């Protein structure tokens, strides 16, 4: 059986973390979970530790000191997942904006030939719920901007709901990934694209969080906007 792990970064997710873990474990297929916990003061880590008694073989956690950023959380998770022999590695938010029931659809896309499957809000129009119209417009046109500048045929360039084949993460030089916020999502897709891997978008409906606090900020969008120009000029090479 394929070994599959869902990486879930957390910071102050006590309202969501137990529910999202149980939702993933309720799926058929034997998914494991790796929580990357960035020192949440609200007790998120304690909730996960208590659940590890119930799921000792399939629930893992890496605790980091302080809020170190989305990109570094996933890089840490990618390295751990590859080192521990997982075949398919997922990214997913803790707040149910990504529907756990879509996880098997991303997995199936990779089984059918994709190297990276993206849960896409924009490949079939705009499929977003509970966002203010201004944020929808900003996110959609940010993806248009990225697609235009980088020449990458991906509609949802900032999507954070993904499934990688392990070969992709073994090939990308993860130590040279520079962006830390949502620009990280762009950089990883662009690296995957430039290294010749097959990317497939799977349509999803994105529902903004109903509990907890959003981690989005203008600085995150700024990094993504300016980072794209530097990314365009950078030569992407596989890890040696």
Predicted regions, residues:
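Cell-envelope/extracellular polymer assembly enzymes that use nucleotide-activated donors
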Residues: 3-5, 32, 187
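Acidic helix N-cap motif at the loop->helix transition within catalytic regions
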Residues: 15-19, 42-51
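Short beta-strand/loop segment that forms part of the nucleotide-sugar
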Residues: 21, 30-40, 62-63, 92
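A conserved acidic beta->alpha catalytic loop
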Residues: 37-46, 96
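Acceptor/aglycone-binding surface of glycosyltransferases and processive sugar-polymer synthases
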Residues: 62-83, 88, 100-182, 209-226
